Amino acid sequence: AQSSTGGFDILNLRWKNREGFKPLYYFLTRTRPNQRSTYFLLIKKKDRDRAIMKLDVTIPSYFKAQIEPKNIRFAYCEAGSVSSRTKCGETIPASISLNNDGKLIEIVPTSPVPTDRTIGVELQVRNPYGRGMYQFNALAQSPGEVTLAKYLGSWVIELKGGG
């Protein structure tokens, strides 16, 4: 996982060692509280081994920000590096809904998404007030499987203090 600050985070190092925990790459355009930000929650092709017919993103209950379905996009993306920024391009046709009082994003593509490219959920959101760490989780269902969702990994997002 990587934040827009690019700094090393000791908690990320600790979480990486937890059995069953898998950090996923993300990028935020702004990390200060109460600022408008774009969240790029990426699932790289190396992070999944099967096509996706449904993707669920769980949001912690203490993440006090308003997320609207119209501000959510599912797309093919490219992770940034030192010389390029993270960006999402071609939109993947999908039905996107919010459930569980806005704490579950359900994405159902019109056809299963193959494993050959990095995909991402792009959110336009106003960051919650105050600093904190928020663990968003990715769960996916694949074609032909029992309807149980498989854990793909987590984005541990840190918002810095100050205003």
Describe the role of every protein-language-model region:
Residues 2-4:
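Boundary of Sec targeting at the N-terminus
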Residues 10, 15-19, 38-43:
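Intrinsically disordered, low-complexity regulatory regions in eukaryotic proteins
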Residues 82-116:
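Extended, solvent-exposed segments with strong compositional bias
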